[in-house]
Design a protein with these regions (language model features):
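C-terminal motif of bacterial Sec signal peptides marking the signal peptidase cleavage site
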Residues: 14-16
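Beta-propeller blade termini
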Residues: 59-77, 117-125, 215-222
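Structural motif
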Residues: 141-153, 238-246
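Acidic/hydrophobic-patterned starts of short beta strands in beta-sheet-rich repeat architectures
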Residues: 75, 127-137, 223-230
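N-terminal, intrinsically disordered, polar/charged segments of Gram-positive cell-envelope systems
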Residues: 20-100
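Positively charged n-region of N-terminal signal peptides that target proteins for export
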Residues: 1-5
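Surface-exposed loop/turn elements that mediate protein-protein interactions on large endomembrane-trafficking
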Residues: 94-111, 152-165, 251-256
Length: 269
C-alpha cells in the first residue's frame, strides 16, 4: 500500500510540474498588397486632329505639290461655293470644310499616283431640296487601265456622310445584272442586258480556256445632275476591251442604284 501511495503521489507531482501549452490562436497572414490596375496610356492624337480652319491652305495644290505631299502636310484639292476639299499626308484621309465645320474621312486617295486634282460637283442628287457634294477621283492610271471612283458627301444637321460609288461597287452590281454567254464552238462571248449586247470572238488558241471577263476600268460622266458610270469589259486572257456597260447612278440619300443599264460594243467581231 505504501508503495502504491508513493507512486500515485509521484504521478500527481509530475502532473503538477508539466506546463500547459498556451492555446493556439489563428491569425491571418498579412494580405499581399493588391496591385493597382495598370493605367492604359492615353492614345496619341492624330497629327491632324487639332487643325482648325485658319490652319488650312487657301491656294489650290499644283501637280508638283501633289507628287511631293509630305507625311504631315495638307493640300487643297478643290472647292465649291460652300465646300473645300483637302487631302492629308501620310495616307490620313481627307478633310471637308463646310460652313466652318470640318469633317474627316479615312478614304484612301493618293494624289502621288494620279497627279490629278479631283473634280467637284454640287447638286441636289437625292431630291431632298439640299445640295450634296459629289467628287470624282482618279484612282489609277496605268497604260490603258484607268479607274475613277465617285464619292457623294451628304450633310445633315449633325453629321456628314460619305457614300463611295467605286469601280468595284458598280462592277459587282453590273455583273449581277448582265448576262454573259460563251459558245466554245465559235469562241464567241456575248454580253447582254435587255436588247443591248456586245459580242467578242476569241482567237483560236484561247477558245478552250477563254478565262474570265472583268470590268477593269471605270469613268463617271456627269450631265444635268446625273452621273453615268462607264465600265470597260475586258477578256482577261487576251487583254481585249470589247464592251462598255453604262448605267445611271441614282442616289437616294443612303445608297445608290444602277438605272438605265445598257451594253455597248467597242470592237467589231
Amino acid at each position: 500500500m505504501k508503495k502504491c501511495a508513493w507512486l500515485l503521489t509521484a504521478l500527481f507531482l509530475l502532473a503538477g510540474c508539466t506546463r500547459e501549452e498556451p492555446a493556439r490562436i489563428w491569425t491571418p497572414s498579412p494580405a499581399s498588397p493588391t496591385p493597382s490596375a495598370a493605367v492604359s496610356p492615353e492614345p496619341e492624337s492624330a497629327w491632324w486632329e487639332g487643325l482648325v480652319e485658319k490652319d488650312l491652305p487657301t491656294g489650290l495644290a499644283s501637280p508638283d505639290q501633289l507628287g511631293a505631299l509630305g507625311e504631315e502636310e495638307v493640300l487643297l484639292l478643290g472647292r465649291t461655293a460652300v465646300t473645300s476639299l483637302y487631302v492629308l499626308g501620310g495616307d490620313s484621309g481627307i478633310l471637308l470644310l463646310r460652313n466652318g465645320r470640318l469633317s474627316h474621312f479615312g478614304q484612301q486617295f493618293s494624289p502621288k499616283d494620279s497627279l490629278s486634282l479631283p473634280e467637284l460637283y454640287q447638286w441636289d442628287y437625292d431630291g431632298d431640296g439640299l445640295d450634296e457634294l459629289a467628287v470624282r477621283y482618279l484612282m489609277e492610271a496605268e497604260g490603258d487601265q484607268i479607274v475613277y471612283d465617285l464619292h457623294i458627301y451628304d450633310w445633315s444637321d449633325e453629321t456628314c456622310t460619305d457614300l463611295p460609288v467605286t469601280r468595284d461597287a458598280c462592277a459587282d452590281r453590273a455583273l449581277a445584272a448582265v448576262t454573259s454567254d460563251y459558245d466554245p464552238g465559235s469562241g464567241t462571248l456575248t454580253l447582254s442586258y435587255g436588247d443591248t449586247s456586245a459580242v467578242y470572238r476569241f482567237p483560236e488558241q484561247y477558245r478552250q480556256s477563254p478565262g474570265r471577263m472583268s470590268f477593269a476600268t471605270s469613268f463617271f460622266r456627269e450631265q444635268n445632275g446625273v452621273f453615268t458610270v462607264i465600265l470597260g469589259a475586258r477578256a482577261e486572257s487576251t487583254g481585249a476591251w470589247f464592251a462598255n456597260v453604262l448605267a445611271d447612278i441614282e442616289y437616294d440619300g443612303a445608297d445608290f442604284t444602277l438605272r438605265n443599264l445598257r451594253v455597248e460594243p467597242t470592237t467589231v467581231v
